[in-house]
Amino acid sequence: MKATEYRRYDAVGLAALIANREISAPEALEAAIRQTEALNPALNAVVHTTYDRARRLAQAALPATPLAGVPFMLKDLGQLWEGVPTTSGSRALLDFIAPLTTTLTSRYLGGGLVILGKTSTPEFGMASVTEPAVYGPTNNPWAPGITAGGSSGGSASVVAAGVVPAAHASDGGGSIRIPSSACGLVGLKPTRGRNPVGPVMSEGWYGLAASHVVTRTVRDSAAFLDLSHGPEAGDPYAAPPPDGPYRQAAQGPHRSLRIGVVEGAMTGDVNLDPECLVAVDRTASLLEELGHRVEPVSTGIGPGPGRRAMLTLSAVDTAWMVGTFDIDVSKLEPANQVVVEAGKAVSATDFADNLYLVRHYGRIMGRIMEDHDVLVTSTLATPPWPHFALQPGAEQRERIAALLEGRYTGSAFQLMEEIATKSMNRIPNTWPFNMTGQPAMSLPIHRAESGHPVGVQFVGRFGREDTLFNLAAQLEEARPWIQDYPFMDPGTTQWAEADRRAQSGRPE
């Protein structure tokens, strides 16, 4: 199977070819392996390959499932496959081999997916870009030297480049939607509790995080959620069960929806790039053309307390993880050593206050959603940006060093907040819905003048992924994007120069 033919198909289409015996699962896998070997030197997106295991999976009898035989990759964070390395983007875990297989991975394998590798992530997923010190930055297939987003940047890069039609991703503050916007993909963060996180963990980041996939088509995202959703024994909570298959919801019929449009930043403290404003405006016009009732809406979510709550919960969880699993803190990236110190400094009452605020935001949005079926926002505040743009500056790096050497007299938490500001200013519309637990999806329905993708975010009521799939399929039909592939020739001087810059280290 040639690369040009392989890339034409989404996961559902490729699975149909395999089911109809037009191609075999081993043929599809070998096409994916060739794509990986040809493109990953330029993408720097795949950090571990499992070709031998994948060949055994492809050659075995496939289950009679809608995605059987499809090549697939796991994000190198959260999801374990027994006997396979999981580094979580950290030098501290380079020797870690998974002792078990997590429930979600088991569901993927049970559905006949052929897992051939693991994709890059920032250390512990603690960034909106994918630039782990241990592996270097992951390139965006649309342009060398531009971020693929994070923390699921490796997965987004390989899907956008046509290495695999879909890849696992996870989202604690936007980490499915950010790279989907940057790389021109469909990226759904499901409802809190929709997909399992066990058997070891009960929730991620105290309910902020969720797992799903990044894909090129709406029907693929729906098909994967049909495969993976549902609680497991011992879950602390579960999402409301769907009325039927998500693939069926995506196929229509379409109904007129009440849609609220947030024209700027949810938090009101960030000015969006003009390209992002245009994307939302054009989307609102398209929705009206399609017969939906569209009106502007203000959410009333302010910047400061929400950001602090997000950072508090993620820092405390990181500090807990490092201590519980006896991770060598000295091997962490300096900024994440600050996160650990900040998390350790949070008092029990401060933690409880911030957890309460997260739940309170859910109440606020729940009332807003009583009058709307869907909210629309820009996914990001800007089009995708160059590598290292969010790294701490020289003065911040000096204070980080002082903290780690015991010379710093200030607050570790305040230093962490300051370091995070650049990133949080790029994602004012993603993290609020990690707090509320609502399903939120980025769709690739706009291109900047530069040619870079600009995603638009669609947010549903709690538990109503079906509404999002139905609307997304309608938009995909009205403004199809499946034919859009990033121009990428890894043999060009442009890519070689980008790779040289990426490997040379952080800018001054």
Functional labels for PLM-detected ranges:
Residues 189-283, 301, 478-508:
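A short helix-breaking turn/cap at a secondary-structure junction
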Residues 54-134:
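Acidic/His- and Gly-rich active-site-bordering loop/insert found
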Residues 414-435:
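Alpha-helix-centered segments that form part of catalytic cores
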Residues 100-232, 434, 438-446, 450-455:
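Short glycine/serine-rich loop segments
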Residues 1-49, 289-291, 450, 484-508:
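An N-terminal boundary/leader segment
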Residues 67-90, 248-262, 313-366, 379-415, ...:
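Short helix-loop capping/hinge segments that flank enzyme active sites or metal/cofactor-binding pockets
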